[in-house]
């Protein structure tokens, strides 16, 4: 969750082929070495953006050689605005006449051979709902009711937002849990219950006291239950995201974003970190504290790898003497726009072999899921990126709003719902998520 809240508070590159050059052998000291030169102007030698076989253009656009060489002069102007940063397609490349076609593309294809199965025969991106122009989080599909739950990060806002997928077109409503859940940012469905990570903290909101932590919500009865709300007496700062392993242990991130999002009255008491919680025994153990702002978390399909997103490019003021806390400050040059992979120890009690796998091409990677094939799917800026498990980009989905979190939905989990700042989109394609 890399949040944007001001409106809510008012309401409460392609490659050109180089020309072949024959290198001249050194037959004498005077023989010059002929080095090929990168062309700086003129018409492109290759087409940077083109149609993808079997798909309509420019809705689906293939980018030559990952866009690694742009002809002539080009510039991507940095826009360090939280929730509205610069994008790949905002790059100005006047010597690449096809680059502007990306403005009208729904899908950018980096790897054409992999994209065919990812996109399926008839991919679509549909803008479904216009919502408040602030952060929305914690999307999760409930197969027992065929609904998609998500939350709004607005000071004092307690209902859950629910999309009813039984209706055509789907409809959006509010449901208030008992007791309410405040500012959920991560969610999973297991064994009939929603497991929610929350960043909301307040001593007297609607007659309740809220603390960041882990909670369950029964979507049938609307009843909630607290699972975890402290680390040996310390409040958590902002329990942001979670996943549940095949043994039932809950792994979750805790960052500094609750107070600058204006949904937590307390400044951080402990450092940002990632934890493992055993709901059977109550034991909570830190497993990593190396990320600036640990955010999204997901397991690989075989549960042997954990992927974490670091959104430390969005920094928070943690000084309790500064009140109210300023909003999160985003800067693209700050470390923390990265997805990391870790091996899960055989004991399933620790994380090993941390390595970076992806530096976001837009904004910072926030919510993250894995597909059945093991692809990484992450909310990044104005869209969603699909990566190999080693971080190679395959496909990017473009949206008209900043996406903060995502969830697979539908009976076959072949729809991806993207939730974010001001909008909700549905992506229908060939990629499928896990049933768990």
Curated annotation (Swiss-Prot):
- Pathway membership of this protein? Secondary metabolite biosynthesis
Question: GO: which molecular function terms?
Answer: hydrolase activity
Signal peptide interval = 1-27
Q: Which InterPro entries match?
A: 6-blade_b-propeller_TolB-like, Oryzine_lactonohydrolase, SGL
Q: Which UniProt keywords apply?
A: Hydrolase, Signal
Q: Which EC numbers characterise this protein's activity in its record? A: 3.1.1.-
Role played: Lactonohydrolase; part of the gene cluster that mediates the biosynthesis of oryzines, natural products with an unusual maleidride backbone. The two subunits of the fungal fatty acid synthase oryfasA and oryfasB probably form octenoic acid. This fatty acid is most likely activated by the acyl-CoA ligase oryP to give octenyl-CoA before the citrate synthase-like protein oryE catalyzes condensation with oxaloacetate to form tricarboxylic acid.
**Stated family:** Belongs to the SMP-30/CGR1 family.
State what protein this is by name: Lactonohydrolase oryL
Upper classification of the source organism reads: Eukaryota, Fungi, Dikarya, Ascomycota, Pezizomycotina
Quick one: which gene encodes this?
A: oryL
């Amino acid at each position: 969750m890399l949040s944007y809240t001001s409106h809510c508070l008012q309401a409460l590159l392609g490659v050109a082929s180089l020309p072949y050059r024959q290198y001249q052998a050194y037959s004498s000291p005077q023989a010059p070495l002929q080095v090929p030169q990168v062309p700086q102007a003129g018409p492109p030698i290759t087409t940077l953006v083109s149609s993808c076989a079997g798909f309509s253009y420019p809705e689906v656009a293939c980018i030559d050689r990952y866009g690694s060489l742009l002809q002539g002069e080009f510039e991507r102007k940095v826009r360090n605005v939280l929730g509205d940063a610069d994008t790949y397609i905002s790059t100005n490349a006047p010597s690449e006449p096809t680059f502007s076609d990306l403005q009208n593309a729904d899908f950018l294809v980096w790897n054409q051979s992999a994209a065919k199965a990812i996109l399926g025969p008839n991919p679509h991106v549909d803008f479904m709902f216009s919502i408040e122009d602030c952060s929305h989080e914690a999307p999760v599909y409930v197969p027992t009711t065929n609904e998609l739950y998500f939350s709004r990060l607005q000071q004092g806002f307690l209902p859950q937002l629910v999309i009813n997928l039984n209706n055509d077109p789907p409809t959006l409503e509010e449901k208030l849990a008992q007791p309410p859940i405040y500012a959920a940012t991560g969610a999973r469905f297991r064994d009939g219950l929603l497991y929610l990570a929350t960043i909301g903290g307040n001593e007297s909101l609607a007659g309740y006291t809220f603390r960041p932590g882990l909670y369950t919500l029964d979507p049938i009865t609307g009843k909630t239950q607290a699972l975890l709300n402290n680390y040996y007496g310390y409040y958590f700062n902002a329990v942001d995201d979670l996943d549940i392993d095949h043994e039932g242990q809950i792994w979750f991130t805790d960052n500094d974003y609750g107070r600058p999002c204006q949904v937590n009255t307390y400044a951080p008491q402990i450092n940002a970190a990632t934890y493992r919680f055993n709901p059977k025994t109550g034991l909570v153990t830190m497993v990593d504290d190396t990320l600036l702002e640990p955010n999204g978390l997901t397991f690989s399909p075989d549960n042997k790898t954990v992927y974490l997103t670091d959104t430390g490019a969005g920094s928070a003021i943690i000084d309790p003497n500064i009140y109210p806390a300023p909003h999160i400050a985003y800067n693209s040059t700050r470390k923390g726009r990265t997805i990391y992979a870790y091996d899960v120890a055989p004991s399933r009690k620790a994380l090993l072999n941390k390595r970076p796998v992806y530096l976001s091409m837009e904004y910072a990677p926030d919510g993250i899921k894995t597909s059945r094939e093991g692809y990484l799917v992450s909310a990044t800026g104005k869209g969603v990126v699909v990566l190999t498990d080693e971080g190679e980009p395959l496909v990017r989905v473009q949206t008209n709003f900043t996406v903060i979190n995502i969830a697979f939905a539908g009976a076959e989990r072949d729809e991806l719902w993207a939730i974010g700042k001001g909008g909700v989109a549905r992506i229908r394609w060939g990629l499928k998520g896990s049933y768990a």
